[in-house]
Amino acid sequence: MASNNVAQFAAELKMPAGVLLEQLQAAGVQKASEDDALSEADKARLLDHLRKSHGATDGDKRKITLTRKHTSEIKQSDATGKARTIQVEVRKKRTFVKRDDVAEGAEQGQAQVAEADDDAELKRREEEARREAELLEKQAQELRERQERLEREEAERRAREEAAEAQRRRAEEEAAAKRAAAAAVEAQQVAAQQAAEAQQETAGAQSAQDEARAAAERAAQREAAKKAEDAAREAADKTRAEQEEIRKRREAAEAEARAIREMMNTPRKAMVKAVEPPKPVEPPKPVEAKGTLHKPAKPAGASAARPAVKKPAGAAPATTAPAGAGDRNKKPGGGKGGWQDDAAKRRGIKTRGDSSGGVDRGWRGGPKGRGRHQDSASTFQAPTEPIVREVHVPETVSVADLAHKMSIKASEVIKVMMKMGQMVTINQVLDQETAMIVVEELGHRAVAAKLDDPEALLVEGETTTDAEQLPRPPVVTVMGHVDHGKTSLLDHIRRAKVAAGEAGGITQHIGAYHVETPRGVITFLDTPGHEAFTAMRARGAKATDIVVLVVAADDGVMPQTKEAIAHAKAGGVPIVVAINKIDKPEANPDRVKQELVAEGVVPEEYGGDSPFVPVSAKTGVGIDDLLENVLLQAEVLELKAPIEAPAKGIVIEAKLDKGKGPVATILVQSGTLNRGDVVLAGSAYGRVRAMLDENGKPTKEAGPSIPVEIQGLSEVPGAGEEVIVLPDERKAREIALFRQGKFRDVKLAKQQAAKLESMLEQMGEGEVQNLPLIIKADVQGSQEALVQSLLKLSTDEVRVQIVHSAVGGISENDVNLATASKAVIIGFNTRADAQARKLAESNGIDIRYYNIIYDAVDEVKAAMSGMLAPEKREVITGMVEVRQVFKVPKIGTVAGCMVTDGIVKRSSSVRVLRNNVVIFTGELESLKRFKDDVKEVKQGFECGMSVKNFNDVTEGDQFEVFEVTEVARTL
């Protein structure tokens, strides 16, 4: 902290303020109280006084030698052409001599010059002193002339003011005279008028003329008086303006004179300081505290005058040798020319906290002298406001990138995340939510960034085609509960036998068919009704125009029926209800209608908008009415789509065929899909190599609302992905690769974020059993359904862990993964190849095959039940009453007992009850009857018993005998 007054400086020196005031008075510094301010010059004068009073001499000179060493390497080829590395070490040595001021520095610089040079130096200094005196005299003469000029201007100003005052007085006198003359004239006129009236009282016409004349004269006199007053006012305003202008000129002249005085004072002190030896009375003197060598920063005049004084001291070496390589050969203490000419050395030695860049710094770096040259102004740093940045956070970002966006160190981000309970590294990828929380925690504003993704080109690059909107067939999704006859109804419509081909008689795949009727084409989507296929049904409702809700007349509304209604309402799709199985004796269509009304589906006959059609998939009753109602709804919707345009659609189902590769069933929603088109479906892309209809027959094109199966994609696309035709395969590849990377980054970030949470959960829950599974299915929809169904089986004690799930056959990679993770492989409608089977047998990997989802779920549930810890139950087998107590040496207390209930076995556990309160629980140590060891004693018999580690048995106690049995638990 810099000392600003006497009291603070005394506290810094750890001495009484009164003693310091006495020393300041002795040094010639006039300070009256402890609150008086102290300048650096005052402190310097006090220091000089104390040095002189203690007998310090100016001849005590010390010097400092700095040695710099720089090592570098160069590579040079020898005669054989082989490169060699040579170490080059450059050493530089400089000597600094302590100086009190510029004059003494010049004398020290000339210490090695001969005595004859001293006389020349003295003459040169006298000449410079004479020139400085002449310059000062000239400046003083100029100042006197300017002061005389200012005095003349002041006299002129006063003269002008007096003249203006005299003019103002004259104007006032003239105005008063005019007013008096006007009053006299008016009095004469009044008297004349009265005389005229007295003389000519009878002449009325003549007096009227006289009155008019008098009124005109009075008006003229008033006008003249008004003009005189205006002239006087203008003269006064002009006088005031002149006075204001004179005052401004005087102030400007005084300010100029003050500036001249300050200008004259500043260089005079600096030049005297540069020529004459330092005097205690001169304030601008170098501050020397505690024997340091530094000098305070000088004003511009001093810095301009200093080279003129320094130059002769080092002129000889600076002028005789050129700058450059010759300067490097000079000795460190030989002169100042080499130090000043070298641009790298001119910057000086940097010290910590010095922001001057080495300019005009007279101190070295080092632990003892560090920071002493700073004045009080440089030590204070104003507080700055925290900078709040707007940070754009992408979907995934590493810790280092996030820190760079906030302009802070990565270690700060890591510290904040450690406080939040998450251990991260500098290269770890964070998801968007976590990164935004960290940004908010650090006081910045987080904004979800919009990525420069190539998908934006899809929207920007869409050319508006003028293709004509033509009517298209309706897309009808058949939905309902399992076993309500959806597929059988479609079979009757298609005249096919699809249901017989499904395993277990239930639909486990989403199917797409189009049917040609006399009134038009209808495209049907058949969705599974099992509860596991929720995602499939949601995809079917998303791509549909009309929903046919199939409800069995004998079963009514079931859970999946309600779910189908919810999907249809969420998509805003009209519903046509088909009440199936009306040919059964127990069919009750009216009950079905009432249940559907309760769910919000009101029939048309009740005033609603949903047609109800009773049908029988077995006999074909009502099929035509159903198709009629579907086409009627389609006409109301007025479904249209462009045909002559690039195709767009949706992936209904996807699978991996061993011979064909990735195969996708897509529904074209607009445009026409041709064989050879480049398609993009999610992260998969490719050229359509083959296109088949639902019957497996090749086709060249597919229009709106037509389902087709395409081949040629790079990978199996996700079910529900949008399919779009692009003109360029390069653009399709770019977008697909971008989507793959984004999906991978997001998945990795979420996995890393969940690692610590799951670890802490497992630590808190104790030992949790894991059932690792690898699932391979024939199509993606079945794989999704099976994964979701199995994950729902997880409990607090046994957890289902899906290590890997994919579409396709079971390969060696799957078996190797199962070996590493100790997982069970489940194949749903898929099989393992020969190599995978052989590898699984050698590694003991269990592979299970299923074709019905019920069986897979039930067997996994049974396996999880076997992993549950068995439940321990206590079974009370008998009660014993203590009749007598015996003390047996080396054995302890033996109780003579009567078995009052049940049976007592040797291996049982026992509780000791006293007054129906349990006082001990342990095991039987011995069980005897008539001195013979027995295994059991039944009710009504006496026996002798001893309890292990318990001898405090009294008569009247009861022993409760029990056994612990383990019971297997089930889910």
Swiss-Prot record:
Keywords: Cytoplasm, GTP-binding, Initiation factor, Nucleotide-binding, Protein biosynthesis
Residue ranges with Gly residues bias: 355-368
Chain spans, region G3: 526-529
Presence of keyword Mitochondrion: no
Region (G5): 616-618
Example GO molecular function: translation initiation factor activity
InterPro entries: DNA-bd_dom_put_sf, EF-G-like_DII, IF2_assoc_dom_bac, IF2_II, IF2_N, P-loop_NTPase, Small_GTP-bd, T_Tr_GTP-bd_dom
Skewed-composition ranges (Low complexity): 105-114, 178-209, 298-325
Region span, Disordered: 49-86, 101-385
Binding positions (GTP): 480-487, 526-530, 580-583
Entry annotated with the keyword Lyase: no
Cellular localization per UniProt: Cytoplasm
Residue span of region G4: 580-583
Compositional bias per record (Basic and acidic residues), positions renumbered to this chain: 49-63, 121-177, 210-261
G1: annotated span: 480-487
Family: Belongs to the TRAFAC class translation factor GTPase superfamily. Classic translation factor GTPase family. IF-2 subfamily.
Protein name: Translation initiation factor IF-2
Taxonomic lineage of the native organism: Bacteria, Pseudomonadati, Pseudomonadota, Betaproteobacteria, Burkholderiales
